[in-house]
């Protein structure tokens, strides 16, 4: 393999200059104004089309070959003429001999007619059709000229195409019809034109969606009304089971929703995943739509769905909808059923978990204020927040009595509570946990030294010393242990942990702490906290009572080591 070292400096300069020239040339050739042409005559034809010079084009008609040459996109001069605004230019190009009106471009498979429609050149469309262009030939996406005309919202082009035999029910690759497109665009005139010419209101695309569902999804009231009056099925469901009303709930258009309900739409019709219209409205944050659907949705339907709209509102981060649902008596602790829970790798069950995993402080606060429990999921909400570095959410969860000493043993079954694993690099988070009663003593329980008291529940579990011996964590052991020592009295360091710590820069400080008696102030705080118990320490009513003066409370609660609160106060 050649390397740059094999070339002289002069050769390298020549090579670089040539590369730059090639790059510039490629960029030039790819630009719309400089598409490759075979002959000078073709270049003149293309320039005349771009500049609208009809007289030059007439002169070039004798060079018929110039009109048959394609550029680098596979475009003939006819394709360019069809998509430019001067009708006389197109008419002049059409006078050239041996031109097929159905020639396709190399990219996109566009015909002159589809290009004219996309460019919204109604006179060009009419001229091409009058010259014999087929209204049925599609581009490479199987999109017909009629479908494209509806998409750009041109009633004139749509009418012209229909008058020249365009088939209203022609489908694209996804079996999407002009009726679907009209429902999406929301053009009443076009829809009425299609209906008068054979448009079917219950035609389904490849996903089972009808024009009515499309209109409802995009909140087009008048289109929805027309389709219903023409016999569209109000409770039609797509292949995924989503109903027309569910689509309307996603748009949030209350007029559409009410219209569907007045015409017999069932608010308790579930999708394949079990979702109802109320779930969609809650997730999307459509407050007024949700307000309409709450009294119409049965508790039985929600139970069968296996998921509460509270889950949906929390997942979507919709605080107003969340408050509305809770105010109407929806259970804040409703657990998703197993079927829905299995759709998530973490097997989540509670609405609180959605809020916490999304890092949504406001929704978390609302749910906790309404009495949300913190221990309803296989993986604790607190562990999720700690792992994500969400300090404010961790504080909220701890204030709501989340268990700081919980365990999650699926990944690693440790002697010490799991939360510490997720914040070894984050002193702020570590101290947030330690200040709120994390059992630091469990980090110094192991079986390595014979002189150490045997502990039954250590057997078969991973002690802290072994966990920190992992090569990816060893460099964190010094700082972690130094922090932990602020929350214990005298502890024994096992030989395994000692060997790890001796290689860390924090070892001299750790050694001094271990070999010196702890201060009376430090020991008093530990004893007071032990006597109070974690339950009382976590109770705001007790800790905010007159029994504890502010200074004493701050001392007991390790306020001088609460790095998060200190940083927050500095910002404020």
Regions found by a protein language model. Name each.
Residues 2-25, 36-37, 411-413, 422-431, ...:
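Cullin-RING E3 adaptor/co-adaptor recruitment helices
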Residues 40, 72-73, 107-108, 140-141, ...:
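Ankyrin repeat start-site detector
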Residues 43, 76, 111, 144, ...:
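Ankyrin-repeat start motif
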Residues 65, 98-99, 133, 166, ...:
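Ankyrin-repeat C-terminal turn/loop position
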Residues 68, 102-103, 136, 169, ...:
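Ankyrin-repeat junction/capping positions
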């Amino acid at each position: 393999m050649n390397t740059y070292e094999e070339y002289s400096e002069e050769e390298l300069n020549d090579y670089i200059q040539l590369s730059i020239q090639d790059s510039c040339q490629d960029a030039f050739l790819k630009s719309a104004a400089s598409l490759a042409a075979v002959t000078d005559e073709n270049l003149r034809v293309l320039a005349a089309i771009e500049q609208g010079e009809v007289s030059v084009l007439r002169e070039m008609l004798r060079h018929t070959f110039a009109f048959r040459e394609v550029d680098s996109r596979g475009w003939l001069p006819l394709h360019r003429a069809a998509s430019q605004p001067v009708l006389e230019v197109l008419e002049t190009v059409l006078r050239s001999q041996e031109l097929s009106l159905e020639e396709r471009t190399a990219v996109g498979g566009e015909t002159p007619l589809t290009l004219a429609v996309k460019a919204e050149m109604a006179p060009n469309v009419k001229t091409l059709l009058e010259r014999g262009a087929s209204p049925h030939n599609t581009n490479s996406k199987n999109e017909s000229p009629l479908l494209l005309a509806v998409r750009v919202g041109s009633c004139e082009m749509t009418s012209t195409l229909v008058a020249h035999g365009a088939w209203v029910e022609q489908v694209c690759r996804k079996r999407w019809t002009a009726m679907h497109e009209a429902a999406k665009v929301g053009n009443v005139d076009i829809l009425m034109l299609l209906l008068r010419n054979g448009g079917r209101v219950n035609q389904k695309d490849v996903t089972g969606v009808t024009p009515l569902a499309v209109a409802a999804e995009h909140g087009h009231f008048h289109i929805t009304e027309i389709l219903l009056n023409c016999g569209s099925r109000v409770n039609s469901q797509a292949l995924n089971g989503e109903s027309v009303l569910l689509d309307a709930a996603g748009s949030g258009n209350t007029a559409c929703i009410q219209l569907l309900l007045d015409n017999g739409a069932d608010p308790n019709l579930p999708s394949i995943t079990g979702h109802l219209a109320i779930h969609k409205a809650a997730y999307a944050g459509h407050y007024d739509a949700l307000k309409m659907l709450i009294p119409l949705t049965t508790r039985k339907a929600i139970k069968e769905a296996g998921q509460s709209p509270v889950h949906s509102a929390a997942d979507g981060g919709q605080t107003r909808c969340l408050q509305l649902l809770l105010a109407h008596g929806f259970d804040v602790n409703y657990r998703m059923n197993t079927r829905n829970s299995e759709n998530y790798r973490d097997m989540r069950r509670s609405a609180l978990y959605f809020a916490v995993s999304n890092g949504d402080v406001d929704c978390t606060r609302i749910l906790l204020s309404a009495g949300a429990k913190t221990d309803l999921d296989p993986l604790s909400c607190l562990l999720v927040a700690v792992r994500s570095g969400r300090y404010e959410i961790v504080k909220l969860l701890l204030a709501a009595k989340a268990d700081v000493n919980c365990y999650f043993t699926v990944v690693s079954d440790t002697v010490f509570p799991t939360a510490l694993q997720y914040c070894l690099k984050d002193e702020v988070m570590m101290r947030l946990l330690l200040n709120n009663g994390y059992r630091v003593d469990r980090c110094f329980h192991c079986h390595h030294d014979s002189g150490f008291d045997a502990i039954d529940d250590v057997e078969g579990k991973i002690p802290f010393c072994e966990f920190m011996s992992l090569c990816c964590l060893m460099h964190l052991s010094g700082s972690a242990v130094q922090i932990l020592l602020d929350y214990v009295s005298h502890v024994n360091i096992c030989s395994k942990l000692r060997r790890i710590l001796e290689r860390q820069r924090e070892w001299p400080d750790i050694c001094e702490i271990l070999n010196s008696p702890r201060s009376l102030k430090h020991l008093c705080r530990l004893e007071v906290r032990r006597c109070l118990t974690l339950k009382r320490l976590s109770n705001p009513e007790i800790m905010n009572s007159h029994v504890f003066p502010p200074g004493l409370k701050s001392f007991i609660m390790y306020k001088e080591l609460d790095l998060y609160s200190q940083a927050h106060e500095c910002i404020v």
